[in-house]
Amino acid sequence: MATRIPKTPSTPPAQKPAGDDGDSVVLERRPQKTAPPQMYQVVMLNDDYTPMEFVIVVLQEYFNKDRETATQIMLKIHLDGRGVCGVYSRDLAATKVNQVMEAAHQAGHPLQCVSEPIA
């Protein structure tokens, strides 16, 4: 007796949707590559009038630095004329600068703080 090979089921022909003339174009969505946001560093500038203790308190209160880290940053500001307090997005950096400037103004100190884009 001969062995029979089973028939493979035939696939039905592809059907076009009604009204499709075969000239359709399929667009594929490519994932967009977004660049990370520009980051800014908040920098405090040295002056001869603002007490060192005030700078330490500002670093602790507005930048969440512990006492030791705040003291190190304060000494860098004092010795180098400027020191980086933190790195943030543009809006958050601007907010931090405003908070520091307002606190200095309220306390009667000429402390200056700026934000700079990181290259």
UniProtKB/Swiss-Prot annotation:
Region (Disordered): 1-33
One biological process term in Gene Ontology: protein catabolic process
Pfam families in the cross-refs: ClpS (PF02617)
InterPro entries reported in the protein's UniProt record: ClpS, ClpS_core, Ribosomal_bL12_C/ClpS-like
SUPFAM superfamilies documented for this protein: ClpS-like
Alphabetical list of PANTHER family matching this protein: ATP-DEPENDENT CLP PROTEASE ADAPTER PROTEIN CLPS, ATP-DEPENDENT CLP PROTEASE ADAPTER PROTEIN CLPS1, CHLOROPLASTIC
Known partners and oligomeric status: Binds to the N-terminal domain of the chaperone ClpA.
Function of the molecule: Involved in the modulation of the specificity of the ClpAP-mediated ATP-dependent protein degradation.
Family label: Belongs to the ClpS family.
Name of the protein described by the UniProt record: ATP-dependent Clp protease adapter protein ClpS
